[in-house]
């Protein structure tokens, strides 16, 4: 941490190198159980560690905090199937997957679910799928993430799945129809921030 320089994190060309370095050092695994390769910390331990990291540079604190609070790691731990945990959690723990959590958009911020994006259950090629329309912005780590937790309001007019309401899905980078190539730089904050957009189908 002593050698950290926030110009290396965002937005210059060394961005990916530094994010990759933090991930490989397991800085993003503090909520993941050891059985999956993580460094499971208590809430107090995590708070103390993030405080120390942020004292070196606030941007570095944000880069480290987001995967260890919002998003796929904790959601998978609490709500994921065993198959999902076995597939995703080791990749998150060892840094081959960098997560972000897409919630906010042009019409929803502090009122996070007020005008949230939508996903509609449809039949496509004989399969039940969800057609998602996304317009997310100000998503921390979006420019560098390769595993995206995306929140949307599920619409199921024909009751194909049996439930509607706000839900979260996991989508990997380069999913057909997903657009993930815009950077924001809010107030020169010094951390990767951007948009998640697109219209696409998920199983």
Where are the language model's segments positioned?
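FAD-binding core of FAD-dependent oxidoreductases
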Residues: 57-74, 92-108, 135-148
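A structural signal for short hydrophobic beta-strand segments in well-ordered beta-sheet cores
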Residues: 119-121
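Flexible, small-/acidic-enriched active-site or ligand-binding loops
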Residues: 176-201
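Short beta-alpha junctions and helix-cap segments that line functional grooves
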Residues: 88, 115, 135-137, 180-185
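Short beta-turn/strand-loop junction motif enriched in small, turn-promoting residues
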Residues: 35-37, 106-107, 136-139, 153-158, ...
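Active-site-adjacent elements of ketosynthase-type condensing enzymes
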Residues: 108-115
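A short core secondary-structure module
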Residues: 128-178
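Amphipathic, small/basic residue-rich leader segments at the start of a protein or domain
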Residues: 1-67, 80-87, 91, 96, ...
């Amino acid at each position: 941490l002593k050698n950290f320089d926030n110009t290396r994190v965002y937005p210059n060309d060394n961005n990916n190198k530094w994010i990759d370095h933090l991930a490989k050092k397991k800085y993003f695994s503090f909520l993941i159980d050891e059985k999956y390769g993580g460094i499971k910390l208590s809430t107090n331990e995590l708070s103390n560690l993030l405080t120390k990291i942020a004292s070196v540079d606030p941007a570095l604190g944000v880069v480290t905090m987001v995967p260890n609070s919002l998003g796929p790691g904790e959601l998978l731990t609490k709500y994921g199937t065993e198959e999902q945990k076995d597939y995703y959690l080791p990749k998150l723990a060892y840094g081959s997957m960098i997560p972000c959590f897409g919630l906010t958009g042009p019409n929803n911020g502090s009122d996070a679910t007020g005008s949230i994006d939508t996903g509609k259950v449809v039949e496509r090629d004989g399969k039940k799928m969800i057609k998602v329309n996304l317009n997310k912005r100000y998503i921390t780590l979006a420019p560098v993430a390769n595993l995206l937790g995306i929140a949307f309001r599920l619409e199921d007019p024909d009751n194909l799945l049996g439930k509607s309401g706000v839900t979260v899905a996991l989508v990997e980078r380069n999913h057909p129809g997903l657009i993930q190539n815009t950077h924001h730089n809010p107030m020169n904050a010094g951390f990767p921030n951007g948009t998640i957009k697109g219209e696409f189908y998920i199983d």
